[in-house]
Amino acid sequence: MSGPRSTLGLSRRALLRAALAGGAALGATACTPSAPATPLVIAGGVRPGVYISLAGTLADIWRERLGLDGAPQVLTTAGSTENMQLLTGGAATVAISQVDVAADVATGITGPGEPMALARLYDDVTHVVVRRDSDFRTLDDLRGARVSIGPAGSGYQPIALRLLDAAGIGADGLGERAELGLPEADAALRADRIDAFFWSGGVPTGGIRDLADELPIRLLDLGDVLDRVRQRFPVYSVGTVPANTYGLPGPVACLSVRNVLLVTAAMDDGTARALIDAAFLDQPRLAQASPAAVTIDSRSAIGTQPVPLHPGALQFYRSAKDY
């Protein structure tokens, strides 16, 4: 899959150099850049993970395509919530986040610090993983169980709490609550220290696939609570994990959430446009970084609502005439 052809009048290298310098007028985008002359800092995610893989690949693409003097810095983080804190606090200039977390953080923020999207990237699905030989079949069965809801700062802990609330359990209804990342939750399930864990990621998620290769698992079907969750939080959608993804007994209904690439309103239009232009030119490299990124294209990339597109990104999509 190839990205749309660039329509910028200036070379991308010249464009971003001018944008980051904050001085030259860019006739191709009819704007005057005003971004400070600071290096790009990308808030990524946990290692290993899709976020950190895509962030690292984007850093390489932008350095090579746009002739940056230094490679963008990629930050290892707990995930969406921490990424949004870094972005809105000025410690990062670019971030990847679930759109629900981004929308929650953006509420009430106006002016230069307002989060704005460059693109929708791919969709995550929420996994609730249990051993196949267990008696757990629905979320309600987790009442009194030992469950990991994900680490603080991740994007999927809020999803886990919302799902548990919709099931009438809530976090207090669990027997023991842990806040483990995927590798730690994987190890804890293998060692029978927990009964279940929540995870939100692309399908397939490598860590879950590796676990399923060694330990028969099931994913809890979320179909009985999805309508209640979506009535309160329409940002979510319904998805399905096919049976053959992890050798499951059958397909599983799940909750799906979009992931978006974000900057703030402080970034000038020329820089924002150059970043997304370069990313689409090298979209196959993003797909190589993670199978989840195979679906990235400019037709679906505009679907970042309720987070607004940055004006520079909107210029790019309009010029691409591909939606």
Locations of regions flagged by a protein language model:
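Bacterial signal peptide processing site
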Residues: T32-S34
